[in-house]
Amino acid sequence: MRSTFLLAISLLLGLISSAQTPCESGFAGIYPCSGYDLQSRLTMAQIGGGSGNDIWGWTSSTGREFAIMGRSSGTSFVEITNPAFPVYLGNLPSHTSNSTWRDIKVHNDHAYIVSEASGHGMQVFELSRLLTVTSPPVTFTEDAHYAGFGSAHNIVIDEASGYAYGVGTNTFSGGLHFVNIQNPAVPVAAGGFSEDGYTHDAQVVVYNGPDAAYVG
Protein backbone atom coordinates (compact mmCIF):
# COMPACT_ATOMS: atom_id res chain seq x y z
CA MET A 1 0.00 0.00 0.00
CA ARG A 2 2.81 2.39 0.92
CA SER A 3 4.70 1.66 -2.30
CA THR A 4 1.53 2.32 -4.31
CA PHE A 5 1.07 5.65 -2.53
CA LEU A 6 4.68 6.67 -3.21
CA LEU A 7 4.32 5.70 -6.87
CA ALA A 8 1.19 7.86 -7.17
CA ILE A 9 2.99 10.82 -5.59
CA SER A 10 5.94 10.37 -7.95
CA LEU A 11 3.68 10.30 -10.99
CA LEU A 12 1.82 13.41 -9.78
CA LEU A 13 5.05 15.33 -9.23
CA GLY A 14 6.18 14.35 -12.68
CA LEU A 15 3.00 15.74 -14.21
CA ILE A 16 3.29 18.98 -12.22
CA SER A 17 6.94 19.47 -13.12
CA SER A 18 6.12 19.12 -16.81
CA ALA A 19 4.02 22.28 -16.55
CA GLN A 20 7.24 24.28 -16.00
CA THR A 21 8.72 25.09 -19.39
CA PRO A 22 12.32 26.36 -19.66
CA CYS A 23 13.23 29.23 -21.97
CA GLU A 24 15.22 27.69 -24.80
CA SER A 25 16.30 29.41 -28.02
CA GLY A 26 14.03 32.33 -27.27
CA PHE A 27 10.90 30.28 -26.59
CA ALA A 28 9.24 28.66 -23.57
CA GLY A 29 7.05 26.23 -25.44
CA ILE A 30 5.15 28.40 -27.93
CA TYR A 31 5.76 31.65 -26.01
CA PRO A 32 8.63 34.06 -26.81
CA CYS A 33 10.98 34.58 -23.85
CA SER A 34 14.30 36.12 -22.91
CA GLY A 35 15.97 34.88 -19.75
CA TYR A 36 12.88 33.66 -17.92
CA ASP A 37 11.02 30.35 -17.81
CA LEU A 38 7.29 29.67 -18.08
CA GLN A 39 6.36 28.52 -14.57
CA SER A 40 2.74 27.48 -15.21
CA ARG A 41 -0.35 28.29 -17.22
CA LEU A 42 -4.08 28.41 -16.51
CA THR A 43 -6.56 28.63 -19.38
CA MET A 44 -9.51 31.01 -19.32
CA ALA A 45 -11.78 28.00 -18.89
CA GLN A 46 -9.87 27.08 -15.71
CA ILE A 47 -10.40 30.51 -14.13
CA GLY A 48 -14.08 31.10 -14.80
CA GLY A 49 -14.43 31.15 -18.58
CA GLY A 50 -15.20 33.83 -21.12
CA SER A 51 -12.63 36.21 -22.55
CA GLY A 52 -10.07 38.30 -20.66
CA ASN A 53 -8.93 41.88 -21.11
CA ASP A 54 -7.12 43.15 -18.01
CA ILE A 55 -4.93 41.85 -15.20
CA TRP A 56 -3.73 43.45 -11.98
CA GLY A 57 -2.11 42.17 -8.80
CA TRP A 58 -2.02 42.35 -5.02
CA THR A 59 0.58 41.38 -2.41
CA SER A 60 -0.62 40.82 1.16
CA SER A 61 1.24 42.18 4.19
CA THR A 62 2.61 38.66 4.74
CA GLY A 63 3.98 38.40 1.21
CA ARG A 64 1.32 36.24 -0.44
CA GLU A 65 0.76 37.21 -4.06
CA PHE A 66 -2.41 37.22 -6.13
CA ALA A 67 -3.38 37.86 -9.74
CA ILE A 68 -6.70 39.60 -10.47
CA MET A 69 -8.10 38.95 -13.94
CA GLY A 70 -10.84 41.00 -15.58
CA ARG A 71 -13.03 38.72 -17.68
CA SER A 72 -16.12 39.25 -19.80
CA SER A 73 -18.44 37.87 -17.11
CA GLY A 74 -16.61 38.72 -13.89
CA THR A 75 -13.31 39.03 -12.05
CA SER A 76 -11.09 36.05 -11.22
CA PHE A 77 -8.71 35.79 -8.27
CA VAL A 78 -5.69 33.46 -8.50
CA GLU A 79 -3.05 32.93 -5.83
CA ILE A 80 0.42 32.93 -7.40
CA THR A 81 2.54 32.88 -4.24
CA ASN A 82 4.14 29.75 -5.70
CA PRO A 83 4.14 30.55 -9.43
CA ALA A 84 4.58 26.88 -10.33
CA PHE A 85 1.34 26.02 -8.50
CA PRO A 86 -1.26 28.78 -9.14
CA VAL A 87 -4.56 28.31 -7.32
CA TYR A 88 -7.83 29.67 -8.75
CA LEU A 89 -9.64 30.97 -5.66
CA GLY A 90 -12.89 32.13 -7.20
CA ASN A 91 -14.92 34.63 -9.18
CA LEU A 92 -16.67 37.91 -8.46
CA PRO A 93 -19.55 38.05 -10.99
CA SER A 94 -20.24 41.16 -13.03
CA HIS A 95 -22.56 43.58 -11.22
CA THR A 96 -24.85 43.58 -14.26
CA SER A 97 -24.20 42.01 -17.66
CA ASN A 98 -21.21 40.69 -19.59
CA SER A 99 -18.80 43.03 -21.35
CA THR A 100 -15.55 42.76 -23.28
CA TRP A 101 -14.06 45.46 -21.04
CA ARG A 102 -13.49 45.02 -17.30
CA ASP A 103 -10.65 46.83 -15.57
CA ILE A 104 -9.20 46.71 -12.06
CA LYS A 105 -7.00 48.82 -9.83
CA VAL A 106 -5.87 48.12 -6.25
CA HIS A 107 -5.56 50.55 -3.34
CA ASN A 108 -5.12 49.84 0.39
CA ASP A 109 -5.95 46.12 0.13
CA HIS A 110 -9.12 46.71 -1.91
CA ALA A 111 -9.81 46.06 -5.58
CA TYR A 112 -11.85 48.61 -7.54
CA ILE A 113 -13.52 47.13 -10.62
CA VAL A 114 -15.27 48.89 -13.50
CA SER A 115 -16.75 47.66 -16.76
CA GLU A 116 -18.35 48.94 -19.94
CA ALA A 117 -21.40 46.84 -19.07
CA SER A 118 -24.45 49.11 -18.79
CA GLY A 119 -25.24 50.12 -15.21
CA HIS A 120 -22.23 48.28 -13.78
CA GLY A 121 -20.78 51.10 -11.68
CA MET A 122 -17.72 50.39 -9.53
CA GLN A 123 -17.40 47.22 -7.47
CA VAL A 124 -15.26 47.27 -4.32
CA PHE A 125 -13.74 44.01 -3.07
CA GLU A 126 -11.76 43.57 0.16
CA LEU A 127 -8.73 41.52 -0.88
CA SER A 128 -7.94 40.21 2.60
CA ARG A 129 -10.85 37.81 2.08
CA LEU A 130 -8.61 35.87 -0.29
CA LEU A 131 -6.38 34.89 2.63
CA THR A 132 -9.07 32.74 4.25
CA VAL A 133 -10.41 30.78 1.26
CA THR A 134 -10.21 27.10 2.22
CA SER A 135 -12.27 25.32 -0.45
CA PRO A 136 -11.70 27.04 -3.81
CA PRO A 137 -13.14 28.01 -6.15
CA VAL A 138 -15.84 30.12 -4.53
CA THR A 139 -18.28 32.75 -5.81
CA PHE A 140 -17.53 36.08 -4.14
CA THR A 141 -19.81 39.03 -3.47
CA GLU A 142 -18.76 42.68 -3.61
CA ASP A 143 -18.12 44.52 -0.33
CA ALA A 144 -19.36 47.87 -1.62
CA HIS A 145 -20.71 49.39 -4.81
CA TYR A 146 -20.58 52.87 -6.33
CA ALA A 147 -23.39 53.77 -8.71
CA GLY A 148 -22.43 57.36 -9.56
CA PHE A 149 -21.64 56.19 -13.08
CA GLY A 150 -22.86 53.17 -15.00
CA SER A 151 -20.31 52.09 -17.57
CA ALA A 152 -16.60 52.97 -17.52
CA HIS A 153 -13.73 51.99 -19.77
CA ASN A 154 -11.06 52.14 -17.08
CA ILE A 155 -10.26 53.34 -13.60
CA VAL A 156 -7.25 55.27 -12.30
CA ILE A 157 -6.27 55.74 -8.64
CA ASP A 158 -4.10 58.39 -7.01
CA GLU A 159 -2.78 56.53 -3.99
CA ALA A 160 -1.44 59.65 -2.30
CA SER A 161 -4.86 61.28 -2.02
CA GLY A 162 -7.16 58.24 -1.96
CA TYR A 163 -9.19 59.29 -4.98
CA ALA A 164 -10.30 57.12 -7.89
CA TYR A 165 -11.00 58.44 -11.37
CA GLY A 166 -13.37 56.66 -13.72
CA VAL A 167 -12.47 57.29 -17.37
CA GLY A 168 -14.63 56.78 -20.41
CA THR A 169 -17.75 56.70 -18.26
CA ASN A 170 -21.30 57.55 -19.26
CA THR A 171 -20.98 60.80 -17.25
CA PHE A 172 -19.07 64.07 -17.79
CA SER A 173 -18.98 63.49 -21.57
CA GLY A 174 -16.74 60.50 -21.00
CA GLY A 175 -14.20 62.60 -19.09
CA LEU A 176 -12.82 62.08 -15.59
CA HIS A 177 -15.31 61.08 -12.88
CA PHE A 178 -13.89 61.70 -9.38
CA VAL A 179 -14.62 59.33 -6.46
CA ASN A 180 -13.37 59.66 -2.88
CA ILE A 181 -12.32 56.13 -1.80
CA GLN A 182 -10.65 57.05 1.49
CA ASN A 183 -13.34 54.92 3.13
CA PRO A 184 -13.62 51.97 0.73
CA ALA A 185 -16.88 50.84 2.30
CA VAL A 186 -18.53 54.14 1.32
CA PRO A 187 -17.21 55.58 -1.98
CA VAL A 188 -18.34 59.20 -2.37
CA ALA A 189 -18.87 61.19 -5.58
CA ALA A 190 -16.47 64.13 -5.81
CA GLY A 191 -17.25 65.76 -9.15
CA GLY A 192 -15.72 65.38 -12.58
CA PHE A 193 -14.08 67.02 -15.59
CA SER A 194 -15.68 67.11 -19.01
CA GLU A 195 -13.95 69.92 -20.93
CA ASP A 196 -11.65 67.57 -22.87
CA GLY A 197 -14.42 65.09 -23.67
CA TYR A 198 -13.91 61.34 -23.77
CA THR A 199 -10.85 60.07 -21.87
CA HIS A 200 -9.64 56.58 -22.70
CA ASP A 201 -6.96 56.27 -20.00
CA ALA A 202 -5.05 58.50 -17.61
CA GLN A 203 -2.33 58.81 -15.01
CA VAL A 204 -3.09 60.99 -12.01
CA VAL A 205 -0.39 62.66 -9.91
CA VAL A 206 -0.33 65.50 -7.39
CA TYR A 207 1.70 68.34 -8.90
CA ASN A 208 4.61 69.50 -6.74
CA GLY A 209 6.64 71.53 -9.22
CA PRO A 210 7.86 75.12 -9.53
CA ASP A 211 4.58 76.66 -10.75
CA ALA A 212 2.69 77.69 -7.61
CA ALA A 213 -0.57 78.02 -9.54
CA TYR A 214 -0.74 74.25 -10.01
CA VAL A 215 0.67 72.89 -6.74
CA GLY A 216 -1.66 70.50 -4.89
Placement of each model-derived feature along the sequence:
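Positively charged n-region of N-terminal signal peptides that target proteins for export
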Residues: 1-4
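Bacterial N-terminal signal peptides
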Residues: 6-14
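Feature marking well-ordered beta-strand scaffolds used for ligand recognition
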Residues: 19-216
